[in-house]
Amino acid sequence: MASRRNARRLEPSPPSGTAPTRTALITGAATGIGLATARALSENGWRVIGTALPGQDVTSLRDLDRTTVLEVDLTDDESLRVLLDAVVAQPRLDAVVSNAGLAVPGPIEGLPADQLRRQLEINTIAPAVLARALLPQLRATGGGMVFVGAGQGRVALPFGGAYGASKAALAALTDALRAEVAGSGVSVSLIEPGAVRTGILTDSTARGHEVLDGMPADVAGHYRAPMLATFQRAEQAFRTAAAPEDIARLIATILDTRTPKPRHLIGREARALALIALLPSSWRARIVQRLAR
């Protein structure tokens, strides 16, 4: 649940005649891309409202200037309500960065339904709920929304069907939202990174092992070898992955741009997936099937 004691008001508005301090809400701000973005915006003079899971280490986030931390479970309706109440109570809101994400790999046959549901709730539904609730504030300031998607939203990879589905759905939502708010002064951007050196890569591998170990033996037998090979490729990708600071700089640039591009590919893997997505479906299927071996 969002912590009410952390839902305090930010610093008072600046005196009349001075430039107002811009305010950004960043979800998943305790680590990785979220923390790097919070740091980049704070260093540029923004106020930051950063969310973190209850119990997460938020020391680095709290140490940033002009930053408020809210403990939030984005899958819990009451927790979301407390978050929204806290944000709406702020004097202004200039940006919403929907960054919080979850990846739990596994075959469709063996992935528990609750793990599929949770990825959709965090990666797709929560960003839509925040956008719906906070659009009035963003209209008032001519602000922007940045959604952190993934290259896998363009091409679904073996054992990443749930994650890819959640990011493909997020991309569809952002495309529709962008068209719906055109002319309102609110910008809507989707970032599609490939591999990034954050905890989501290592955490997803650990979760994938749990999924594999929890499958019935007759099901696991079909998938163990290719899943382990997938985890090995993920470890290799981690070594050459983009730094979270690269994504943070892009987000900061987007928020300083009046009319940013609708979509932003970043990283070698994301660009490769974007090219694969352009191929005829039969070619694309053969390439993806090779990754399931």
Whereabouts are the PLM-identified features?
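Substrate-binding pocket helix/loop in short-chain dehydrogenase/reductase
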Residues: P107-I108, Q115-R117
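Conserved glycine-rich cofactor-binding loop
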Residues: A30-T31
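Conserved NAD(P)H cofactor-binding loop of Rossmann-fold oxidoreductase domains
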Residues: N99-V104
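C-terminal beta-strand-loop-alpha-helix "lid" module of Rossmann-like NAD(P)-dependent dehydrogenases
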Residues: G183-E235
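Rossmann-fold cofactor-recognition segment
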Residues: L64-E78
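Active-site helix of classical SDR
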Residues: A131, S166-A169
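A short, exposed helix-loop element centered on a Lys and neighboring polar residues
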Residues: A131-R132, D175
